[in-house]
Every structure is written in structure tokens, then in C-alpha cells.
Amino acid sequence: MQKNKAKEPRLIVGVIILMISNIIVKVIGVLFKIPLHDLLGDRGMSYFNIAYNLFTTLYLVSTAGLPTAISMMVSEARVKGKKAEVRRIFRTAVCLFFILGTIGTSIMLFGAGGLAKLMGSADASWAIMAISPTLFLICISSSIRGYFQGHQNMFPTACSEIIESAGKFILGIVLGTWAVRTGKSIEICAAYAIAGVAIGEACGLVFLICAKFLHKQDYSYTLAEDDGTVSSSKKILKNLLLISVPVMLSSVALNLTSTIDTFTIINIIKRYSSAETAEAAYGNYTTLAVTLFHLPSAFIYPISTSLAPALSAARAAENKIKERSVLSASVKMTVIISIPCAIGMALMSKPILGLLFSNEASVNSAAPLLSILSPAIFFSAILTVTSAALQACHYQRKPIISMVCGIVAKAVASCALMSIKSIGILGAPIGTLVSYFVMAAVNFMFVLKYVSSEINIFKLIIKPIVASGLASILTLTSYNAIYRAGHPTVGTVISIALTVFAYFIFLFVLKEFNRDDIMIFPHGEKIYKALVKMHLMK
């Protein structure tokens, strides 16, 4: 009994570990883009981002869904006490990832020229070749991460991601700076900078391999006795593909929002402007606005990553109460985190960008793009957590329908709007916002129909919206007061800190949290008693 009680907060522990690592990774990512943007400029960053977005798309085509499939299958086998099957799942997955990684890297390496021309920027081919080894490395890393996530052990994943990001940051800047100082062309400088991504990924893989060799399995198999049966490698491979292919298709569809931008922004804007202007607009949008848009995902990704194996384990154990508890807690956390991020980013887009990037002209261009894009943070978060829930409950095909609907909306809206010269690049974030709204709405309807009809999204969002609105008044008031005193940077930092503090105080005042919400955290009893003493809870 005590053992089960100890394991109760495992979901939230995994979320916290991944959340901390993701915040660090995202901060490193932003810090990487700031000096890189200063080195390469908007045009050089367009080559960097074209290569990186292409890599992301091919990575998703090659392997997206397989880490989720591994974590779900390992989690279910672990609950049933099947140690030997867990080992076979891992070996089968590594072999599959090795093949897929080799194919993907070959496509990028030998097809770089054609792919770059297809995206309207032939000079990006050098950057595409430089990042190509990353695809093979990340395939192997993903198989090991899926194994650990199936054990609901998020620590190796978290550490490896931090190592990768740190390596990318340090080596990317060093190589990019060296290339610029030695007078190499801007496209070659972008290739040197993006090579740091591959080297950083290699460092993370070395850590994961060491962690796998040191991992002790015995502690995880306490829920059932091993009956000695082990599925064949062929059956495991079939199950991996049955679970992962729909997940991969939905992930690819989701990534197509950025892929559509990669293919359309330069090609459409070139019709009524120069190629250099089009490349600069793409580089500005993807480096500044899109980078900040993805920053809040550091808080959401850990929830969905921890949700899939936890929900799979609850279903395998036929524990309906825990299943509902895990799902409702995940959705509630997602809503509470994403709403203030969306509102705050929309209101403070220019000060936040100005805090991070020194080029005033680039900040002025990107600020309205980020303001338009920011509401999509909420819809993206809902989409992420509902997709994880559907996939964990073996409704992997449902998110594909949502994604297809959203991609059609994105393509139509972005292309139609960007074709209007007076709208131009603004059409890209508008199309993305429409796309995420459609995908999130359709996905949530599937969750209500197939997973749980007890989630009331409107009830969940009312108090966070009210708290965010009240906190936003404080944000704007404090920022404007300090800005008028001649300290815009200080004003941005202080107003953001005050807003975060005020938001959670308002949530407690509005009685958004109950005792059960607090008890799922490690040391929940102590936290609850402290909150009662502060008169924030009864």
C-alpha cells in the first residue's frame, strides 16, 4: 500500500523534471538565436531555419510516434511484469531506428541541392548538408528516450536534452563566429553554425548510451509477476508501427504548419518584392516571432510526454479512477499554464522581443507577427495534450483527422492572405492561428467522444482567463510606469515577474485549486499546510 502511495505522484514528478529541463533547453535555444541572429542577420538565419525546418520534417517522417509507441509498449509490459518483453521491445526499436536514421540522413545529404531549390533558396543547400547527420543521431537517441519514458523515468531524457542544447549553443556560436571572422560567405557561415546542432546531438546520445548501460530494471517491475511469455520481434515491430504510424502522420501534419511557411513565404513574397526582401522576411519571422511562440511549449511538452505512459499504464491495469484523474489533471495543468502565456505574449510582444534581440528594426518587424501568433499558444497546448490522450488510449488515427483539417485551413488562409501585398508576411501567423484553432477544436471533440465526456473546457478556462486579465492590468501598468522612467529593460523584467506572481495569487483567490490538486505534487501535504497558513486555501 505504501509503495503504491509513493508512486502516486510519479506523473507530476515526470512533468516537473521535464518542465525544468525544457525551460533550460528553451532558454538556451533563445540565447542561441540571439547572437546567431547578430552574426548571420535575417538573410543568413533564413538559410539556417530552412535547413532546420527541413530536418524537423524529415525527422518526424522517419521517427515521430516511435518514441511514444516505445514508451506506451514498455509501460504496458512493465505493468504486466514482462521484463524480457521490455528488453525485446527496446532491441527491436533500436534496429528500426537505425535503418530509418540512415535513410533520412542519406536523403538530406545527397538531396540537399534539390531540396533547397524546391524551397526557393538554393544557397541553403550547405546548411542542409551540415545538419544531415543529426537525423541519424536523434533516431538512436529517441529509441533510448522512449525506453526510459516507458519506465516513467524522465531524468535521462531531461539531462540529454540539456546536454544537446548546451552543445548546440556553444559549438554553433563558436563555429559560426569563426566562419564569419574568416570571411566566408553567409550561406557557408549558416552551415558552420548549424553543424553545432549535430555535434550537440552526438553529446546527448553519448550520455543516453551511458545511462542505458547503468540503468537497473528491477525497481520498475512490482505490479505483477512475469508469466514468462514474450512476443516475437515480428509482432513487436508490427505493434510499434501500428501505434507509431498514425502518431507520425499526425506529428508530420502538425509540423506542416512550419513547412508550409518554409515553402510559401519566400515564394509568394518574391512575386511582389525582391528575393532578398522575401528571405529577410522569412528569417525575421521564423527567428524572432516563431522562436518566442514555441517558448511556452517548454511547460506543455512535459505534460503530454508524461501523460502517454501514465495513461497507458492506467488503462492496462484497468484502473478507471486513475485514468480519469491523470487525464483531468493534465488538461487542467495545460489550461492554467497556456492561457497566461498566450495573453502575456500578445500584450508584451515588443518589450519581450526587445529584451532578447538588439536589432530594433527586426524587433519592430517581428512584434506584430508575434502578437497575432500568441493566441495560438493556447490552442497548440490543448492540441498537444489531447493528442497524447488519444494516442495513449489507442485512438491514434483521430488526431490525423484534426491535423488534416488544420493544415487545409493553414494552407488556404496563409496563401490567400500573403498573396495580398498590403497583408504580406502577416498572413503567415494568421494562417497558423486559424490552423491551431481548427485542430484543437476537432481534437477536443474526439477526446469528449472517445476518452472522457467529463471534461468541461469552458469551466476550466474561465478562472484562468479572469486571473490572466487581472494580472495583465498589473503588467501594463507596471511596465508603462517604469518605461516612462527611462528603464524599458528593467520594466519588462519586473512586470513579467509581478505578473507571474499575481496570476497565481489571483488563481488562489478565485479558488481554482483544491486540496487534491496540491496533493499530487511531491511533498503535497507540506505545500497544502503552508498554503492554509497563508490563507490561500482552506
Enumerate the language-model features and the residues they cover.
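Membrane-proximal transmembrane or re-entrant/amphipathic helices at the cytosolic face
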Residues: 477-538
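Signature of the first transmembrane helix
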Residues: 10-68, 98, 105, 109, ...
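N-terminal membrane topogenesis motif
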Residues: 1-28, 84, 88, 227-254, ...
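Helix-loop junctions and terminal segments of transmembrane helices
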Residues: 64-79, 297-318, 327, 387
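Interfacial/gating helices of multi-pass transporter permease domains
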Residues: 36-57, 186-191, 235-243, 266-294, ...
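Membrane-interface junctions at transmembrane-helix termini in multi-pass inner-membrane proteins
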Residues: 137-160, 375-405
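Membrane-interface helix-loop junctions in multi-pass transport and translocation proteins
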Residues: 155, 166-211, 397, 407-441, ...
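Interfacial segments at transmembrane-helix termini and the short loops linking adjacent helices
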Residues: 113-131, 346-377
